[in-house]
From Swiss-Prot:
Protein family membership: Belongs to the EF-1-beta/EF-1-delta family.
Keyword Acetylation tagged: no
Name of the protein: Probable elongation factor 1-beta/1-delta 1
Species name: Caenorhabditis elegans
Top-level division of the source organism's lineage: Eukaryota
Gene: eef-1B.1
Taxonomic classification: Eukaryota, Metazoa, Ecdysozoa, Nematoda, Chromadorea
GO cellular component: cytosol; eukaryotic translation elongation factor 1 complex
S-S pairs: none
Length: 213
C-alpha cells in the first residue's frame, strides 16, 4: 500500500499499483482505501494518474458512513457508531409503575425503531471484475482496442487498470479491471456489448475473476 499519496512519487507508485489491482490492498475495498481517499482529498490529474483517478471516482461513489465500515487488511470492520440512535433504551425508565404503561412505551419505541431501520438505505452492492479481452491476431491495434472497450459507459460502471499479456504466437490479450454496481450492470450484457460493438477488434471476452466488494 502507498503511504504518501500527497507526493508525486507516492502518487506515481500508487498509480502503478492500481494497474495490477482494483484497490489499495487487492480486489476488495478496505480501510486502507478509505485512508488514502481522505489523504488525497481530491481527484488527481487523470492524464498523469489515470488509474488513481478511476480508483478515486469509485471510492467517492460510497458515502462517508460506508467507508467507515471497511475493514483494514487483516482486520475487522469497526463497530457501528452509536450515533445512529440504535442504542436507545427500549424499556424506558425504571420509575414506571404500571405494567400496561411500560408495555405501551416499549411497543411505541419498538415501532419507531423498526421504522427508522426500514428507512436506512443499505450499502450499494458492487463487484470487482477482471476481463480478458482477446484480439483476432497479432495485427490488431491493442491500443485502439483498449480505447474502444473504455468508451463503453454505463451507470454503475467504472473502468480500472489494464495490461497486455502475451498468449502465444506474438499475440497479446488485454486484461482490464472494472468495478460494477450489481443492480445496474450485468457482466453478460457488458461482454456482449464489447464483442458485438467491436467485433472487428475483439475475438472473445472471458471473466478471469469476479469478486463481491
Amino acid at each position: 500500500m502507498v503511504a504518501d499519496v500527497k507526493s508525486p512519487a507516492g502518487l506515481a507508485a500508487f498509480n502503478t499499483t492500481l494497474a495490477e489491482q482494483a484497490f489499495a490492498t487487492g480486489f476488495v475495498l478496505s480501510g486502507e482505501d478509505a485512508q488514502l481517499f481522505a489523504a488525497l482529498g481530491s481527484a488527481p490529474n487523470a492524464s498523469t494518474y489515470p488509474n488513481v483517478a478511476r480508483w478515486y471516482a469509485n471510492v467517492a461513489s460510497y458515502t462517508d458512513a460506508e467507508r467507515k465500515t471497511w475493514a483494514s487488511a487483516g482486520g475487522s470492520a469497526p463497530a457501528a457508531a452509536a450515533a445512529d440512535g440504535d442504542d436507545f433504551d427500549l424499556f424506558g425508565s425504571d420509575d414506571e409503575e404500571e405494567d400496561a404503561e411500560k408495555a405501551k412505551i416499549v411497543e411505541e419505541r419498538l415501532a419507531a425503531y423498526a421504522e427508522k431501520k426500514a428507512k436506512k438505505a443499505g450499502p450499494i452492492a458492487k463487484s470487482s471484475v477482471i476481463l480478458d479481452v482477446k484480439p483476432w491476431d497479432d495485427e490488431t491495434d491493442l491500443g485502439e482496442m483498449e480505447k474502444l472497450v473504455r468508451s463503453i459507459e454505463m451507470d454503475g460502471l467504472v473502468w480500472g487498470g489494464a495490461k497486455l499479456i502475451p498468449i502465444g504466437y506474438g499475440i497479446k490479450k488485454l486484461q482490464i479491471i472494472t468495478v460494477i454496481e450489481d443492480l445496474k450492470v450485468s457482466v453478460d450484457d457488458l461482454i456482449e456489448k464489447i464483442t458485438g460493438d467491436f467485433e472487428d477488434h475483439v475475438q472473445s471476452v472471458d471473466i478471469v475473476a469476479f469478486n463481491k466488494i
